[in-house]
Amino acid sequence: LGDVYKRQDYFQTVKGGGHGDYRLITLAPASVQEMADFVKLGFDLAFKYRNPSIILADGVIGQMMEKVVLPSPQPRLTEEEIRQARPWATQGKPAGRTRNVITSLELDPARMEENNLRFQAKYQEIEKNEVRYEELDCTDADYLLVAFGSMARICQKTQEMAAAEGIKLGLLRPITLWPFPSDIISCYADKVKGILVPELNAGQMIEDVRLAVNGRVNVEHFGR
């Protein structure tokens, strides 16, 4: 646990966790405010797509002290409102409808394939609608940093130091690690001279950055 703050375990949340072609909506906060905001966002996305979401916050963000503005409380839904908004929800067996059985277990091969294709269609919908990222001073940048979490905060100071040396350095911060902002990173491959991916690990997100640029620009890693 002596170096737990370092572990930005991108692989664990974005790539790992179990077998099967499943995906986790992964939110990466870079501030204490986002830590709070992403709890609600994570639940909203999970309910919207009926898909697990996870917040990947490293130890630096977890131990940081900053001011936070909490959202206003929302009224609890009544049982009838839940039935209208979430007809799949398990609430016992209310009168007027058949019971809900939530399971992904299918023993018939045709039904199994149908189920898997339905999941993949859902993941494509998430990739289409839910990619989130932040761009800082990227418009005329000669070089690009791609970083998430506390490392993105550190990179903002790096940008200031680079500007003092006359280096045009942009920062692209993925907010969703999945769905990953591959398209926007791909666009920068034709605009910048090089990309650096700083991470608090030995090199994990850099693999997806390299896939996004597809060899069109040099991508290097800096990690601890």
Pin down the residues of each PLM region:
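Short coil/turn connectors at secondary-structure junctions
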Residues: 7-8, 20-24, 48-52, 139-143, ...
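Short, solvent-exposed amphipathic alpha-helical segments in soluble enzyme
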Residues: 40-45, 70-73, 157-168, 186-190, ...
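Short, small-residue-biased leader/transition segments that mark boundaries at the very start
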Residues: 1-5
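Conformationally flexible catalytic loops at phosphate/diphosphate-handling active centers
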Residues: 50-135
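Peripheral docking tails and interdomain loops at the edges
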Residues: 195, 199-224
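Conserved thiamine diphosphate
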Residues: 6-58
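Redox- and metal-dependent alpha/beta enzyme cores, enriched for Fe-S-associated oxidoreductases
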Residues: 132-168, 172, 178-184
